[in-house]
Design a protein with these regions (language model features):
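NAD(P)-cofactor binding segment of oxidoreductase domains
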Residues: 60, 74-102
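Rossmann-fold cofactor-recognition segment
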Residues: 30-46
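SDR active-site strand-loop-helix element
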Residues: 6, 29, 62-64, 101-106
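A generic structural signal for well-ordered alpha-helical segments
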Residues: 20-21, 52, 94
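Conserved glycine-rich Rossmann-like NAD(P)H-binding loop of the short-chain dehydrogenase/reductase
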Residues: 11, 25-33
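Structural signature of beta-strand start/N-cap positions in the alpha/beta core
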Residues: 2, 25, 56-58, 100
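N-terminal Rossmann NAD(P)H-binding glycine-rich loop of SDR-like oxidoreductase domains
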Residues: 1-23
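NAD(P)H-binding glycine-rich loop region in Rossmannoid oxidoreductase-like domains
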Residues: 42-82
Length: 107
């Protein structure tokens, strides 16, 4: 099974990296591409959806989020793009490819 993990360098993502390895081939995507197999551009939802389609995973696990709460108030557009528009694009790409989507969030 091929698993695409978005947000693999975050608090939840790092734990998921360890937990998902026994389940299949894990492809890690991060915003900056550091310690990742692919870069995930959350500022461009269409590009993000294309990346999801290109990877062709059976399961997409989204642990990525805009988590800078104070900054989100002053940069609401970026927070909305990452936490809403990007997630919608990921969901649409999963629908197109038949991939199962698992979305994680913390508060």
């Amino acid at each position: 099974m091929k698993i695409l993990l978005l947000g693999g360098n975050g608090q939840v993502g790092r734990e998921l990296r360890r937990s998902l390895v026994p389940l299949g081939d894990v492809v890690v995507a991060t915003r900056d591409g550091v310690e990742a197999d692919v870069a995930a551009n959350f500022d461009e939802p269409a590009a993000l959806a294309a990346m999801v389609r290109d990877v062709g995973a059976d399961v997409v696990v989204n642990a990525a989020a805009y988590t800078a709460v104070d900054k989100a108030e002053s940069d609401a557009d970026a927070a909305f793009r990452t936490n809403a528009e990007a997630v919608a694009a990921i969901a649409a790409a999963c629908t197109d490819t038949g991939a199962l989507l698992v979305h994680y969030s913390t508060d």
